[in-house]
């Protein structure tokens, strides 16, 4: 039997399921469950409530309190695009109902749901959508015709967190591993515009899924791409910033960029 653990959510997120802890500190412990059918789960005719219900039940049984899911992924089935690449809608006729079933399942299992809108995969393949990032008109079409109605659906879903894009750096020049690369400033603007919409149209929190610690450091890292100053340089906005950093920490480890590789800073 899994060991019982206190289920305490990150303070900046929903307090709907939060339990008080002796230390009064919050722990966001969760699982990455990005898809069942890549890019087709929501609005792509592949919704499987049994899969997600069973998965969420298992996640909860191990004491986790959050789960991360990819929504559009590379854009293969959602949102809806016109022939010239502008976004005209959220997706197919079942997009809204699929999304809200996922949201309600997470709530029923007392899980914070981190909805990752996009992935760097949108810059790969023949049907890629890198221009959604680089072309501000197309970015705006996504915000207006897909993200805005989506946020309306999510109104009141306090256990939901929005993630703009998974590992955006792999779409960005200098680090690009995709078929089409975008300028760093374009990706920052894309992220900031999504953050602005989320903050202007909802009470939800927003982040982005940086690929490495080295991209979120003004010290010994490559750059601090996602701090307030960097995002505002790319797109001046009082609210187009992140609520918290979300950094992927995976092989190869140990990394020279991890805090564990450096002596503690003096207390001032």
Predicted segments with their positions:
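Classical eukaryotic N-terminal signal peptides for Sec-dependent ER targeting/secretion
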Residues: 1-11
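Transmembrane beta-strand segments of Gram-negative outer membrane beta-barrel proteins
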Residues: 23-33
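Short, solvent-exposed loop/turn elements at domain surfaces
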Residues: 27, 36-43, 78, 254
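Acidic/histidine-rich helix-loop elements
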Residues: 32-51, 83, 218-222
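Aromatic-lined substrate-binding rim segments of carbohydrate-active enzymes
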Residues: 49-125, 143, 147, 151, ...
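Extracellular glycoside hydrolase catalytic/binding regions
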Residues: 132, 137-161, 165-268
């Amino acid at each position: 039997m899994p060991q019982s653990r206190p289920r305490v959510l990150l303070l900046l997120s929903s307090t709907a399921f939060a339990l008080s802890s002796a230390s009064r500190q919050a722990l966001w412990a969760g699982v990455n469950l990005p898809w069942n059918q890549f890019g087709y789960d929501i609005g792509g005719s592949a919704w499987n409530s049994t899969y997600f219900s069973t998965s969420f039940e298992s996640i909860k049984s191990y004491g986790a309190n959050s789960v991360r899911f990819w929504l559009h992924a590379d854009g293969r089935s959602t949102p809806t695009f016109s022939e010239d690449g502008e976004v005209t809608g959220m997706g197919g006729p079942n997009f809204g109902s699929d999304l809200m079933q996922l949201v309600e399942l997470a709530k029923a299992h007392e899980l914070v749901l981190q909805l990752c809108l996009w992935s760097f995969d949108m810059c790969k393949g023949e049907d890629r959508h890198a221009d959604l990032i680089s072309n501000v008109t197309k970015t705006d079409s996504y915000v207006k015709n897909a993200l805005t109605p989506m946020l309306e659906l999510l109104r009141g879903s306090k256990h939901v967190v929005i993630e703009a894009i998974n590992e955006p750096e792999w779409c960005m020049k200098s680090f690009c591993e995709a078929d089409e690369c975008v300028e760093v400033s374009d990706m920052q603007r894309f992220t900031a515009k999504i953050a602005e919409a989320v903050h202007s149209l909802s009470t939800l929190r927003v982040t982005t899924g940086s690929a490495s610690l080295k991209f979120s450091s003004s010290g010994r890292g490559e750059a601090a791409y996602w701090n307030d100053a960097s995002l505002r340089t790319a797109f001046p906005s009082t609210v187009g910033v992140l609520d918290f950093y979300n950094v992927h920490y995976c092989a190869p480890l140990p990394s020279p960029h991890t805090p564990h590789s450096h002596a503690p800073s003096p207390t001032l």
